[in-house]
From Swiss-Prot:
One of its GO terms (biological process) is DNA-templated transcription. This is DNA-directed RNA polymerase subunit beta. Keywords: DNA-directed RNA polymerase, Nucleotidyltransferase, Transcription, Transferase. It comes from Mycoplasmopsis pulmonis (strain UAB CTIP). GO terms for cellular component: DNA-directed RNA polymerase complex. Gene3D superfamilies: 2.40.50.100, 2.40.50.150, 3.90.1100.10, DNA-directed RNA polymerase, beta subunit, external 1 domain (2.30.150.10), DNA-directed RNA polymerase, subunit 2, domain 6 (2.40.270.10), RNA polymerase alpha subunit dimerisation domain (3.90.1800.10), RNA polymerase Rpb2, domain 2 (3.90.1110.10). It is an enzyme of class 2 (transferase). The keyword Transferase applies. It comes from the Bacteria.
Length: 1216
């Protein structure tokens, strides 16, 4: 009976067909995965700079006699004349930045005479983003990481616990982007507590005092905010509100009281106290909510949240246009307010169809805005609020019981500062929330968090720079004569330039790009962090902030995050996530109407827009007409789960990989793995080194082709046409759209070094005569094969123990992997040397190096530079350099020798560039940068030479390997092929893994991949298993059966030492494995002589400092337990910090005399000095009658004989 076919053969990339078992009817194709970087930077260049310049100009002098204006639209960005590819290559070679110059046209206007003059001024150099979404800063590729921060706005919270007092509080925080924070709160646990307000970190004061400062009376407060006990308690404690005082007196006293708290220590004047609050909250220059903050505030303070599911306690009457006509009632009293009715009422207020409430009716006038009315007269009209009365319950409505007044701010507000209507609406919301009207905010929800991308971060730096420059310009205008003022001589562009330079060089958000492999490069650009300026601190961030949130679905990957102290603080964008104009993350869905899915256009929604809507998974059953065929559907609604009929579904996911990042989406059978191991798998894929021979996985997820398509390392055709020439260095395509048949040439990269020392080499995947379309891939890069990502290798793996060598996740590999270069990779090391000028003399490039052996100089040419192609090892000279010693560097012994022999000792020392310790390889390139050739170098540097050494690294014991499921280990043994267990047909295994590594880790995905991989290899086909919609267990068993393999996937394996079958069958199959960047060659290290710490006199630690191995507390216990007293004494004295002891030991070893006794370790002396600092005199009592003072530790470094001997060795024989 023929097997039922559960799969389709689909194309992945241009050259690969795979079996696809997924159930999803239609999956949305991926758009540019680097759009978050590119779109943000384009917005900055094309829109934000112009708008910001308009904000800061004109700049007027203090006497208003002269002003500098910006000529609108005159901004000009001068980009490099050469192509981006050439400019980037040159920047990397010369160690400079790839940038464009910003010019603006400024106009000087003398107000008295009307005289006008113009100047074009350079404002700054702006680093340009490359087409791959990165920046070249000082020759290095960097990425600006996007930041996830709390959005400006008003945030309400009920029963939050105070960290200091442990009491429960209700509170509201009003957070601007720039300006003073406001916090209003009261204690929930006490009925007698009053509501207090706090501005910034100043002392809190009564909320009623704050309201009194605007002119609110006790009566108007009750009308607007209700008769709650909390408000009554607050008013009863307010001593300013006296019965015999008029409102003017009350207001004056309240303003002075607030001034004393907020401006503590400053002298009170009537004008200063009157304008304090208006300057703090209503002045846009000092208080800025930003466009996003205003949007958030208007959304929060709308009536919608509070009136939904309540009953109207009044008629909603439309404005009467014709006074002769009777007013129309939109909704009568007693109407139950549904979602749609609430939206209609809110919109009616916004469109002005319902009459607003004027705060003047409550005794509040526009003078609350103080002096700001002079500069912004429009504020006079900003005195309106909206509001309606509601019943909370049906019972209250039927009995005409307690009514609640719900107030919203002016819905037409667009100002970036607070308005009096905002303050009234915020306080009304606060008191209503105490009555459970409205909803509190979740600070960890993406409803309240936004992304700050590269464009906005750069704009912030430009703002700071322009602010400093504005101040500097105004000072210069005041101090110079008007006739001498020109826009050019008073514009100090260093203020802006330094700000941008500092940001790119030292900001936490400007990061060295991870270029280990193409996936790590794309992931770095899609990374988002909660750390950095204005963000969280990793030391104080709580669990709640780090945890996965329901609103992350489709926006932030719940899997990919670091494992260390940054867990949950550094995240990655989900596959389809986008950022809207306000910075909120969106995810796409297909609209569903009456159970029919519209696949024509995806709808992008923010977390807030998902409220009160239902969402189904992409894998539900849908027929060819788009109709949902399941009777009941599991849906996500209000971030919870429910079961509904198809007609109740509003939207459907666009893909099964919607919730995961690119790295997590490339793990097959992700749904069968524990989340912790999936996290490790995602992270380790980014550490896989590109291999010499790339190989795409037999079992993929389908995203590999998408990553290849969007990787900046792969070349894509920019025209439709025909390939007319191909070789290893270039591809030529004849443009079919061009009448003249113009030819487009694409240069291929070869052996280009990355930031991490891995290699980018492009190879063509098209042939002569191939027809290509615009956007088609025409080359593979490192870690790609035939248009798919290929980070590792498909190897034959068996799960079995082998003489204890795979204990604790250790890995046993076959020698075949070494001989056949299966896991061989190439790494490039760049070594640089500079030639400087100094008073003592100049550094010289030479092949004639004093005291250098012929062996170490064997690869140098006549100029002293290593030849390209040379095989070099540790200690070989790459560039010969001699430097002047200078008189101050000549020791007394050398001066004495000079006197004895009347001979001028060579004044030059060998400072050549040598191959680093533990390094070897082939010299593949030498770059010479010098002033003579017109290269820009730092002062005092005449020339700089860079040497590139490539090293071929085969897999060896100590290297780290991993699969895609978090299954990692270190190679413990490389076995000859004949010693590896083999299958019935004689095929030896490539790798042996420990089966005990699977059950407790719960990453079963690796076992499923193993079996399906084996079937793929036998059948000669490739499979695709998308995340959450992959190949099922039954399909794997069918594939194994089709390949004539056991349905269990277990096989008979033979022991090569005996030739007998191993007792039990074991799981054998093909698994995709990586070699990670944690290689033993980078870690192997030993020390014989090296530097010591100045304080403790102990050897330094770490390979980079040629340090020693720490012999710590526990190691000391180990030797103590064995009674190895002499070894222990030697380690803790001579080999560590006994200065005199180690000098004496050196003398004894060189002279062959008896070894000395060890002395007092320096660390003990450091302790003694610390005790002396506390006034405690420490003495050693060896015998009852003797007292020994601790040594002063002032030792002579060497005696004269030793110094003479050392100096004489430095003098070459030819000089005598």
């Amino acid at each position: 009976m023929p097997q039922k076919i559960n799969y389709e053969l689909k194309n992945f990339g241009q050259y690969t067909k795979r079996r696809d078992y997924s159930k999803t009817r239609f999956s949305l194709p991926l758009t540019d995965v680097l759009a978050i970087q590119k779109e943000s930077f384009d917005w900055f260049l094309n829109k934000a700079i112009e708008a910001t310049l308009r904000k800061y100009y004109p700049i007027k002098s203090s006497n208003n006699k002269v002003e500098i204006k910006y000529v609108l639209g005159s901004k000009r960005i001068e980009k490099p004349l050469v192509t981006e590819q050439k400019a980037v290559k040159e920047a990397k070679q010369k160690g400079i930045s790839y940038s464009a110059r910003l010019y603006v046209k400024l106009q000087k206007h003398i107000t008295e005479t009307g005289e006008i003059s113009f100047d074009e001024v350079i404002l700054c150099d702006i680093p340009l983003m490359t087409s791959s979404g990165s920046f070249i800063i000082n020759g290095f590729e960097k990425v600006i990481v996007s930041q996830l921060i709390r959005s400006p706005g008003a945030y309400f919270a009920q029963k939050t616990r105070d960290k200091q007092s442990d009491d429960l509080f209700n509170k509201v925080e009003v957070l601007p982007r720039i300006g003073s924070w406001i916090e209003i709160k009261h204690k929930v646990t006490s009925n007698l507590d009053s509501v207090k307000i706090k501005i910034d970190k100043h002392k809190s004061f009564l909320l009623t005092t704050f309201l009194s400062s605007f002119g609110f009376t006790e009566e108007s407060m009750y009308k607007l905010f209700g008769n709650s006990e909390t408000l009554k308690n607050t008013l009863s404690k307010d001593k300013i509100l006296g019965k015999n005082k008029d409102i003017v007196e009350i207001r004056k006293e309240a303003q002075e009281n607030i001034f004393r708290i907020v401006r503590r220590g400053d002298r009170i004047t009537k004008e200063a106290s009157q304008n304090l609050i208006s300057n703090l909250l209503f002045n846009e220059k000092r208080y800025n909510l930003s466009k996003t903050g205003r949007y958030m505030l208007n959304r929060k303070l709308s009536l919608f949240d509070r009136i939904i599911t309540t009953y109207l306690a009044q008629d909603i009457v439309l404005k009467n246009v014709d006074p002769t006509m009777e007013a129309k009632i939109l909704y009568p009293k007693g109407t139950y307010i549904t979602n749609d009715i609430a939206i209609e009422i809110q919109n009616a207020f916004k469109e002005g169809l319902i009459k607003n409430i004027d705060l003047k009716d409550y005794g509040i006038t526009s003078d609350v805005y103080g002096k700001l009315l002079d500069t912004n007269p429009k504020l006079k009209n900003r005195m309106n609020i909206i509001g309606i009365y509601i019943f909370k319950s049906k019972k209250a409505m039927e009995k005409d019981g307690e009514k609640h007044f719900v107030i919203g701010n002016d819905p037409t507000s667009v100002e970036n500062h607070l308005l009096i209507s905002d303050i009234v609406a915020i306080i009304n919301y606060y008191f209503n929330l105490n009555e459970n009207i409205g909803r509190d905010d979740d600070p960890d929800s993406l409803i309240n968090k936004r992304i700050v991308s590269v464009g906005e971060l750069l704009l912030n730096q430009l703002n700071i720079g322009l602010l400093k420059m504005e101040k500097n310009t105004r000072e210069k205008m005041s101090s110079k004569e008007i006739s001498r003022i020109t826009p050019k001589n008073i514009t100090n562009n260093k203020m802006i330039q330094n700000q941008i330079k500092t940001f790119f060089n030292s900001s936490k958000l400007s990061q060295f790009m991870d270029q280990t492999n193409p996936l790590s490069e794309i992931s770095t650009k899609r990374k988002i962090t909660s750390l950095g300026p204005g963000g969280l601190n990793r030391d104080t961030a709580q669990f709640e902030v780090r945890d996965v949130h329901a609103t992350h679905y489709g926006r932030i990957c719940p899997i990919e995050t670091p494992e260390g102290p940054n867990i949950g603080l550094i995240l990655n964008l989900a596959t389809y996530a986008k950022v809207d104009e306000y910075g909120f993350l969106q995810t796409p869905y297909f609209k569903v109407t009456n159970g029919i899915v519209d696949f024509s256009q995806p709808v992008y929604l923010t977390a807030h827009e998902e409220i009160n809507r239902t969402f189904a998974q992409s894998s539900i059953s849908i027929d060819e007409n788009g109709k949902i065929t399941d009777e009941q559907v599991i849906v996500k609604s209000n971030f919870d789960y429910n079961v509904v009929s198809p007609k109740e579904v509003d939207y459907i996911d666009v893909s099964s990989k919607q919730m995961t990042s690119l790295a997590a989406s490339s793990i097959p059978f992700l749904e069968n793995n524990d989340a912790n191991r999936a996290l490790m798998g995602s992270n380790m894929q980014r550490q896989a080194v590109p291999l010499l021979f790339a190989e795409a996985p037999l079992v993929a997820t389908g995203i590999e082709a998408d990553i290849a398509k969007f990787s900046p390392n792969n070349l894509k055709s920019t025209v439709d046409g025909e390939v007319v020439f191909v070789d290893g260095s270039q591809i030529k395509i004849k443009d079919s759209a061009s009448e003249k048949g113009s030819i487009k040439t694409y240069q291929l990269k070869t052996f280009e070094k990355t930031n991490q020392g891995t290699v980018i080499s492009q190879s063509p995947i098209v042939k002569m005569g191939d027809k290509v379309l615009k956007g088609d891939l025409i080359s593979d890069s490192s870690s790609f094969k035939d248009g798919e990502m290929a980070l590792g290798k498909n190897v034959l793996v068996g799960f079995s123990t082998w003489n204890g060598y795979n204990y604790e996740d250790a890995i046993i590999v076959s020698e075949r992997l070494v001989k056949d270069d299966v896991f061989t990779s190439i790494h490039i090391e760049e070594q640089t040397i500079q030639f400087r000028k100094s008073k003592a003399g100049d550094d010289k490039l030479t092949a004639d190096i004093p005291n250098a052996s012929l062996k170490s100089r064997r690869h140098l040419d006549e100029n002293g530079i290593v030849r390209i192609g040379s095989e070099v090892v540790t200690g070989d000279i790459l560039v010969g350099r001699v430097s002047p010693k200078g008189d101050e560097n000549i020791s007394p012994a050398e001066k004495l020798l000079n006197g004895i022999f009347n001979q001028k000792i060579s004044n030059e020392k060998d400072t050549s560039l040598k191959v680093k310790n533990g390094h070897q390889g082939t010299v593949i390139d030498v770059e010479i940068l010098s002033r003579e050739n017109g290269n820009v170098l730092e002062e005092e540097i005449d020339m700089m030479i860079k040497v590139y050494v490539a090293q071929k690294r085969k897999i060896k014991v100590g290297d780290k390997m991993a699969g895609r499921h978090g299954n990692k280990g270190v190679i413990s043994r490389v076995l000859p092929v004949e010693d590896m267990p083999y299958l019935e047909d004689g095929t030896p295994l490539d790798i042996i893994l420990n089966p005990q590594g699977v059950p407790s880790r719960m990453n079963i995905g690796q076992v499923l991949e193993l079996h399906l991989g084996m079937a793929a290899k036998k059948l000669g086909v490739k499979f695709v298993s998308p995340v959450f919609d992959g190949v099922k267990k039954a399909d794997i068993m069918d594939a194994l059966e089709e390949a004539k393999l056991p349905r269990t996937g277990k096989m008979k394996v033979f022991d090569p030492t005996t030739g007998e079958k191993i007792d039990n069958e074991i799981s054998v199959g093909v698994m995709y494995m990586f070699k990670l960047s944690h290689m033993v060659d980078d870690k192997m290290h030993s020390r014989s002589i090296g530097p010591y710490s100045l304080i403790t006199q102990q050897p330094l630690g770490g390979k980079s400092q040629n340090g020693g191995q720490r012999f710590g507390e526990m190691e000391t216990w180990a030797l103590e337990s064995y009674g190895a007293a002499n070894i222990l004494q030697e380690i803790l004295t001579y080999k560590s910090d006994d200065i005199q002891g180690r000098n004496n030991l050196y003398s004894a070893l060189t002279s062959g005399t008896k070894l000395p006794k060890p002395g007092v370790p320096e660390s003990f002396s450091v302790l003694a000095y610390e005790l002396r600092g506390l006034g405690i005199k420490l003495q050693i009592h060896e015998k009852e009658e003797e007292k020994q003072e601790l040594p002063s530790q002032e030792y002579e470094s060497l005696n004269l004989d030793q110094e003479l001997k050392t100096a004489s060795e430095n003098v070459s024989e030819s000089e005598f």
